Amino acid sequence: MNKRLLAIILGLGMALATPHTAAADLIFDANLGGVAGSGLGTVFTILTMQSPGSGTFESGSVERSSGADVKSDTGVLASGGTTNVGNVKTGASQTLTRTLGGNGITKASQIAIVFNADEPSGNSIALTGLQMSVFNGDTDIFDAHLGASVTFATTFTGIGKEGFVFRLDSAEAAALQALLNLLTPAAVAALRLGLSASASDATGGPETFNVATITAVPVTLTATPEPGTLLFAVTALVGLSFLAWRRQKKTF
């Protein structure tokens, strides 16, 4: 068999064996959070929103501009774009950017966004969008997004529970850490986190998002190849193998 062809086949085989996941910068980690809040330190509210009137959709955001927090009813959608159904709660302790230093966060892998859904009788809710932004002064230096909507069949009743925890995936944690490594410890502590979110099937509320510090080592998630990637790799391997067989047959 031609050595070059063999190298291509081996390369495709290695690509097939390498885990590949769909883009998702923020991932839900069921190993953290819950009523006991295992693996989390103190939480600080960053965003509070509630579906207006008898509606079941809600959205809200907070970011940094001109040295102050900017609160809005606009929330990001994981499917793309934004929605502005509202309504964001603007109380001093309800919606505000939070500093990394205020949470004792020094590493990107320690950042946790905790979603506390307050639904009647612990009913279901769907988080339809979530974006975390890191601000250095007024400059947005880093964004991480939820890859797809996440539905929670049951929720914790009452406000103040630890809720559902989202953290950066390994690639995004490394990317943010690379930025943090360029700053002094004081500059890292001064960085602020902003948030944009949306939810559906929200009949109670208000829903809150907290910033927390991950004190436990995150569990490494096993990645599964995407169907499209798997099909492409298998097809390519079969095709190249057939081509190699044809060439080898002609030599006899």
Where are the regions that the model predicts?
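Bacterial N-terminal signal peptides that target proteins for export
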Residues: M1-I8
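Residue-level micro-sites within transmembrane alpha helices that shape
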Residues: K3, P19, P225, W245-R246
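Bacterial N-terminal signal peptides
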Residues: I9-A17
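Sec/Tat signal peptide C-region and signal peptidase I cleavage site
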Residues: T18-A24
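Intrinsically disordered, low-complexity segments enriched in proline/serine/threonine
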Residues: T21, T220, P227-T229
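Helix-boundary and membrane-interface capping/anchor signal
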Residues: D25-A223
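A short, hydrophobic C-terminal helix/tail in secreted or cell-surface proteins
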Residues: P225-A244
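C-terminal membrane-anchoring or membrane-association module
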Residues: F242-F252
